[in-house]
Amino acid sequence: MSRVCQVTGKRPMVGNNRSHAKNSTRRRFLPNLQNHRFWLENEKRFVQLRISTKGMRIIDKKGIEVVIAELRARGEKV
């Protein structure tokens, strides 16, 4: 399973660790992904999404039905 938010599309990005001596080594910045179950009232079932915490805030703002409709319009299986 890839580390990609299903709502926002956030992915890991790369950067550098910086020591006190300014040495740099490559590292990855991972998104804060959570597996979360949401109840769909109109379908009478749970859906499990792998979403970032920003994706959770978007769902709180728009509502889960609207977000699921947008995912299905993009062709993502939910």
Swiss-Prot record:
GO terms for molecular function: structural constituent of ribosome. It holds the Pfam family Ribosomal_L28. SUPFAM superfamilies: L28p-like. The keyword Membrane does not apply. Keywords: Ribonucleoprotein, Ribosomal protein. Residues 1-23 are annotated as: Disordered. GO terms for biological process: translation. It comes from the Bacteria. Signal peptide: none annotated. One of its GO terms (cellular component) is cytosolic large ribosomal subunit. HAMAP family: Ribosomal_bL28 (MF_00373). Belongs to the bacterial ribosomal protein bL28 family. This is Large ribosomal subunit protein bL28. The lineage of its organism: Bacteria, Pseudomonadati, Pseudomonadota, Gammaproteobacteria, Alteromonadales.
